[in-house]
């Protein structure tokens, strides 16, 4: 049943969100992975629709350029890995490529990821570290893909893409998880509606 619901959700026939419910959708899609969302919860839900593969786990001391880009502190040691979401286990075409940074005190997250594939990484990190995420900052930008990312998508280097940098903070303003995601151009859109209050 869960696989059937996940498949229908991937096809855009309805959407399921935790603590929100299920909503039937009627929307024409051009291209297998065109997705449109109008809230932040939807973006996290989007990533969790697809199977993930963890690659290239490494310990890294942040240089100034990387720390500045991710909103972290230069010289800090982090554990970085690739979180690749694919269309399905049968069709392992990449949907999104994400570089995730966690701190050494959250190392156990890497073991939990294998056992709890439906849980978001921030959920696992909260459980392991005892920190509670109270704020998420997201920065969207149009950019080009570095070669190691374009190779995963099987497109030329410097192909256009959407980059999303996310920072998950606790109540003290300390980072729990930071990530940098790449989506292929024209496969993802994010819209915001503002309403004037009287």
Residue ranges, per PLM feature:
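A generic structural motif
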Residues: 18, 28, 58-61
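Short, cationic-aromatic polyanion-contact patches
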Residues: 20-37
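N-terminal helix-turn-helix
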Residues: 1-25
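C-terminal all-alpha effector/ligand-binding and dimerization domain
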Residues: 50-198
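Short, charge-rich binding segments
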Residues: 14-15, 45, 71-74
């Amino acid at each position: 049943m869960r696989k059937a619901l996940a498949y229908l959700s991937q096809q855009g026939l309805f959407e399921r969100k935790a603590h929100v419910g299920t909503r039937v959708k009627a929307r024409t899609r051009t291209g297998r992975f065109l997705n449109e969302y109008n809230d932040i919860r939807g973006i996290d839900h989007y990533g969790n629709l697809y199977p993930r593969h963890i690659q290239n786990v490494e310990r890294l001391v942040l240089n100034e350029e990387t720390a500045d880009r991710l909103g972290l502190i230069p010289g800090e040691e982090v554990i970085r890995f690739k979180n690749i979401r694919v269309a399905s286990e049968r069709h392992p075409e990449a949907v999104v490529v994400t570089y995730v940074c966690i701190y050494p005190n959250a190392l156990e997250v890497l073991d939990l990821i294998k056992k709890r594939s439906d849980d978001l990484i921030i959920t696992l990190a909260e459980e392991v570290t005892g920190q509670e995420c109270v704020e998420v900052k997201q920065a969207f930008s149009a950019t080009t893909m570095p070669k190691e990312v374009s190779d995963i998508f099987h497109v030329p280097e410097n192909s256009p893409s959407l980059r999303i940098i996310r920072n998950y903070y606790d109540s003290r303003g300390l980072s729990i998880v930071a990530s940098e995601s790449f989506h292929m151009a024209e496969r993802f859109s994010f819209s915001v509606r503002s309403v004037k209050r009287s």
